[in-house]
């Protein structure tokens, strides 16, 4: 009887422990986004056309993990060349906005001004797809590689005031987020 009880306890722990783990791993993190943007930089340097195709392949786990994905913007015209939402390919990144925050312009301006291959962070507010929870702070790691601006964004659960100074180009987005929460 003791062995059966122990077996049931182990099975229950395995079941409920895995449910909790699945929930915790529903969203990508900064630690996952940064290596992904580095892989995107390397792929763009190797072959831009092949890289953009790979970024658009939702089954390619090098560039799609949980809610993380690589996006690309043609720096000459500001239009998406790769985006998870295929309906955005060919549209202007400058049109992305949340309320008064025209974060698409900020992303494009940041990546255009970035040194070649250097990863820079940009923070803004965005709606998390599939939720009705309102705006969530989001940070995108972006880089300029040749004619492309590339990025990978992850959602932050809560932006702490001390973090505002860590990401200088993002302070205004953080202030807007805090203002909108009040």
Locate each region found by the language model:
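N-terminal membrane-sensor/transducer module of prokaryotic signaling receptors
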Residues: 2-182
């Amino acid at each position: 009887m003791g062995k059966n009880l122990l077996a049931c306890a182990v099975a229950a722990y395995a079941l409920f422990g895995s449910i909790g783990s699945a929930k915790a791993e529903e969203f990508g993190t900064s630690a996952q986004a940064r290596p992904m943007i580095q892989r995107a930089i390397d792929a763009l340097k190797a072959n831009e056309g092949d890289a953009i195709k790979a970024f658009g392949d939702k089954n390619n786990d090098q560039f799609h993990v949980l809610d993380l994905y690589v996006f690309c913007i043609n720096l000459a015209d500001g239009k998406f060349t790769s985006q998870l939402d295929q309906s955005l390919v060919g549209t202007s990144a400058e049109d992305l906005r949340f309320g008064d925050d025209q974060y698409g312009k900020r992303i494009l301006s940041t990546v255009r001004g970035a040194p070649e291959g250097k990863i820079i962070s940009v923070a803004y507010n965005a709606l998390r797809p599939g939720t009705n929870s309102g705006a969530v702070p989001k940070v995108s790691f972006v880089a300029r590689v040749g004619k492309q601006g590339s990025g990978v964004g992850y959602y932050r659960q809560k932006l702490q005031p001390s973090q505002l100074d860590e990401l200088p180009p993002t302070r205004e987005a953080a202030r807007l987020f805090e203002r909108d929460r009040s």
